[in-house]
Amino acid sequence: MAGIFEDDKSVVRDMEKKTPIVVPVLVIGFNRPDILRQCIAKLRESKPQNMYFACDGARADKEGEDAVIREVRSVMENDIDWPCEKHYRYNERNKGCEVTESEAISWVLSENEYIIVVEDDIIAPYSFLKFAQEMLYLYKDAENVYMISSNNQTPMPLPNNEDYCFSNYGHIWAVSYTHLRAH
């Protein structure tokens, strides 16, 4: 008996194809080179085409932190071994997490309409990057969508077995749009 598909092998091949991640991915790191390596190793599986990196400067009162920061920056510059655009923003002095992240996001959004933000301790699988990219495109003109986040604070399933939902609560790890930075 013939299968549903004339050529089952072509269906499998199509399922194995990955949608390229073309939305810029911003990786924000600080003083955890080993954790950053894990983050980049996971991103390597997705091979985003446009990578941005930001790193704060060492704190003056933390002896030896400048060497750790140099190592983090080396990881950012040398562990990306797939073809992609690479952009770097490094603070010469420490500005703190809030300022560094805000400035880095503004920097990327000054050059791009969309952004996916990944902090160094986020291990973002391809499924999240693809989801984020698809949602950015889908909701780009929705004025009631301020951010897209991979977050689940409740163990209960979503109604109707939905894959995602709208919430009145934001979560800081997310993606965003240029036009919303003004709000």
Which residue ranges define each predicted feature?
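N-proximal low-complexity "stem/linker" segments adjacent to membrane-targeting elements
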Residues: 2-41
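Acidic donor-binding segment of Leloir-type glycosyltransferases
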Residues: 46-87
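A short, glycine-/small-residue-rich helix N-cap motif at loop->alpha-helix starts
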Residues: 92-100
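Active-site nucleotide-sugar/metal-binding loop of Leloir-type enzymes
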Residues: 102-114
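Short beta-strand-to-loop acidic/aromatic patch adjacent to the donor-nucleotide binding site
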Residues: 113-123
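Conserved donor NDP-sugar-binding/catalytic core segment of glycosyltransferases
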Residues: 129-161
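Short glycine- and hydrophobic/aromatic-rich loop-to-beta-strand nucleating segment
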Residues: 171-175
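Conserved small/polar residues in nucleotide/adenosyl-binding loops
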Residues: 178-183
